[in-house]
Amino acid sequence: MTKYAKIIGTGSYLPPRRVTNHDLATQLAEKGIETSDDWIVSRSGISARHWAEPDVTSSDLAVKAAEQAIEAAGIDRQSIDLIIVATSTPDFVFPSTACIVQEKLGITNHCPAFDLQAVCSGFVYALATADKFIRSGSHRNVLVIGTEVFSRILDFNDRTTCVLFGDGAGAVLLSASEEPGILSTAMHSDGRHVDILCVPGNVAGGNITGNPFLHMDGQAVFKLAVNVLDKVAREAMEAASVTPGQIDWLIPHQANIRIMQGTAKKLGLPAERMVATVHEHGNTSAASIPLALDVAVRDGRIRAGQTVLMEGVGGGFTWGAVLLRM
């Protein structure tokens, strides 16, 4: 049985359209809704986000990120034997976005491909799932992607949510290895909190039933997130006998700089050891962690042999952590 699942390549993609807080404030003002750069930055740390054009889908973003990860890994794409896509904004009700990505990438080896839906915890859940497949010995090269077009589900009459989210994709290639890779994973959920972060609508009989836009109780999410993120991070570290002092980099879900800083502080980690891209990306849900990872890998901050702690929290309520060696 393979001992580890190791990241051998990363990639990411942001749509070209960059929307600043000033741009968004101008757009909302036309609807009679007040906001400002200061208001958004002070509450979230977000200065800009990227939004996809109307004809661009989650799979389009995913393919761009995957191409980079495959190139970085230096492997034949036909050797990929499993594709997992974490998304809450799939191209269609079905088939899965993962199958669409498989076709667009030209992977013709009939490997399994499926979507995983855990909202902003999605990438952590997907990474943990891929880890289990590799450790079992059933698969050797797994493409894991987080991709979202949250701009499609934003209510632009609600300034408390529409200013927070962006679109994008991030990807990693995990490969079976005898060298340390993923050291531990931890995942949890609590369905009692379904209503604090959700899109409470559906399509039935060709009609939309309920609210098709994102709804969030920001205060409830904040309180729960800081609490569970600290606990799940410590759970993952304890499982691998790693202390906070041994963590080189913390990559939290990029939702809100205050939640991120609160989590780092509880763990006793200085801000300099936290990768933060929320100011430029906004909250990209399942894409946020792999996007931040790829940015830090490509700018040289994250290097081979370093210990990285990733943690995410999202609707459901879901949360999880992955501790790994690069």
Swiss-Prot record:
Pathway: Lipid metabolism; fatty acid biosynthesis. It is found in: Cytoplasm. Pfam families: ACP_syn_III, ACP_syn_III_C. Keywords: Acyltransferase, Cytoplasm, Fatty acid biosynthesis, Fatty acid metabolism, Lipid biosynthesis, Lipid metabolism, Multifunctional enzyme, Transferase. Its main location: cytoplasm. Residues 254-258 are annotated as: ACP-binding. InterPro entries: ACP_syn_III_C, ACP_syn_III_N, FabH, Thiolase-like. The keyword Lipid metabolism applies. The gene is fabH. It comes from Cupriavidus necator (strain ATCC 17699 / DSM 428 / KCTC 22496 / NCIMB 10442 / H16 / Stanier 337). This is Beta-ketoacyl-[acyl-carrier-protein] synthase III. The last Arg residue of the ACP-binding site is essential for the weak association between ACP/AcpP and FabH. Homodimer. Catalyzes the condensation reaction of fatty acid synthesis by the addition to an acyl acceptor of two carbons from malonyl-ACP. Catalyzes the first condensation reaction which initiates fatty acid synthesis and may therefore play a role in governing the total rate of fatty acid production. Possesses both acetoacetyl-ACP synthase and acetyl transacylase activities. Its substrate specificity determines the biosynthesis of branched-chain and/or straight-chain of fatty acids. GO terms for biological process: fatty acid biosynthetic process; secondary metabolite biosynthetic process. The active site is at C120, H253, N283. CDD domains: KAS_III (cd00830). It catalyses: malonyl-[ACP] + acetyl-CoA + H(+) = 3-oxobutanoyl-[ACP] + CO2 + CoA. GO terms for molecular function: 3-oxoacyl-[acyl-carrier-protein] synthase activity; beta-ketoacyl-acyl-carrier-protein synthase III activity. One of its GO terms (cellular component) is cytoplasm. Its EC number is 2.3.1.180. Belongs to the thiolase-like superfamily. FabH family.
